[in-house]
Every structure is written in structure tokens, then in C-alpha cells.
A protein has these predicted regions:
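Short, solvent-exposed loop/turn and secondary-structure capping segments
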Residues: 75-78, 149
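Export/targeting segments at the very N-terminus of extracytoplasmic proteins
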Residues: 13-72, 112-113, 174
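Catalytic and substrate-binding regions of cell-wall glycan-acting enzymes that process beta-1,4-linked
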Residues: 127-180
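Substrate-binding/active-site groove segments that recognize
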Residues: 79-102, 117-120, 160-163
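Short, functionally critical alpha-helical segments immediately adjacent to catalytic or ligand/cofactor-binding
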Residues: 57-74, 88, 115-119, 135-142
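A short, structured beta-strand-centered segment in the mid-to-C-terminal lobe
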Residues: 103-114
Length: 180
């Protein structure tokens, strides 16, 4: 007998119902989990909320970095090869991407992996350095560059100020729609 490799009838049972998906999204939007104010698809908002919680990164901080780094553009590529919505630098021989992949279990060049990697780094730096401006500086300059700046008496940069300002705006936006 011939073995079926694909059973279309069985597959239809497990396919998502678009109407059901829409109802779930509407309910999550009504509850404040998703927001029309966030210029990302709901799936990406879900990734960001999930990874923020997992890695100890405030959701408004992750939104602020995504806005500042790429204006929420997953296809963005920076001058030094940074990629994705969170503009993750691959590092020498892709060593930074390897570190992120080892920590998160996800490929940082995919949307979920890029968001996870950014949230991981932000949560790590926030826990390590204790405030948003220092965490933003380490995220943007690397830890060595940030330490060098701090040793020279520089405690903030235009980038860290922009992130902090955007974070404060996102905090107001998030609180306004109950999406804490």
C-alpha cells in the first residue's frame, strides 16, 4: 500500500481559523495587550511582550530602542552591519549573534530572534548597570565603549537621551491603553 505523506483532510483540522484568530486579536486589543499605537504587527508585539517578560526588560524600553534603532523596520541594516528591528550587531565573525543565539535559542536574523536578542541584551544591561541611560549606552556602544565613556565622565549620550525620551513617551502610551 502507498503511504500518504500529506493528508489534506487531516491538515485542514489543524489549520488556524482566520475568524478565530481575528476574534482572539480583537480580545487582546480590547484588553490592552496589543495596541494600534505600536507600529508593529500583533505577532511582533506578542514577541516583544513575551521576551521583555522573559529577560527582565521593560516593554516601553524595548519599544523605545526599536523606534530609535530602526523605526520598527525589520529590514533595516545599519552602517556597521546591524540588522533588524533591534539593530543587532553581528560582531567579529558573527560572535555577537552567536552569543545571542546561545542565550535565547533563536536566530537573531529572524523577527522573533531579533526581538528576543534585543530584549535579552537590554534586560542584561539594565540589571547590570541599574539605569536606562547606562543600559542604552551599553546597548548602543557596546560595554567597552560605554565603560570608556563613563570613565571619561560621560553619563549620557544623544542616543541614550533619545531612548529615555522615547521610553517615557511609550510609558504614557502603554499606560493610557492599559497595556503596562
Amino acid at each position: 500500500p502507498t503511504e500518504l505523506l500529506f493528508n489534506a483532510a487531516a491538515e485542514e483540522e489543524y489549520m488556524e481559523d482566520p475568524q478565530e484568530t481575528e476574534k482572539i486579536e480583537e480580545a487582546l486589543l480590547a484588553q490592552g495587550y496589543f495596541s494600534l499605537a505600536v507600529p508593529m504587527p500583533y505577532e511582533w508585539q506578542d514577541y516583544m511582550r513575551t521576551y521583555c517578560e522573559e529577560y527582565g526588560c521593560p516593554y516601553p524600553l524595548a519599544l523605545a530602542v526599536a523606534q530609535t534603532e530602526s523605526n520598527f523596520d525589520m529590514d533595516a541594516v545599519g552602517a556597521s552591519g546591524e540588522v533588524g528591528i533591534m539593530q543587532l550587531n553581528p560582531g567579529p565573525g558573527s560572535s555577537y549573534h552567536a552569543e545571542i543565539q546561545a542565550a535565547t535559542g533563536l536566530d537573531p536574523t529572524t523577527t522573533s530572534g531579533n526581538i528576543a536578542g534585543g530584549c535579552y541584551k537590554l534586560g542584561l544591561y539594565l540589571a547590570k548597570y541599574g539605569n536606562v541611560e547606562k543600559a542604552a549606552m551599553a546597548y548602543n556602544m557596546g560595554e567597552g565603549g560605554a565603560r570608556s565613556a563613563w570613565d571619561s565622565g560621560i553619563t549620557s549620550t544623544d542616543y541614550s537621551k533619545a531612548v529615555k525620551e522615547a521610553m517615557e513617551t511609550w510609558e504614557c502610551t502603554v499606560n493610557a491603553w492599559g497595556g503596562v
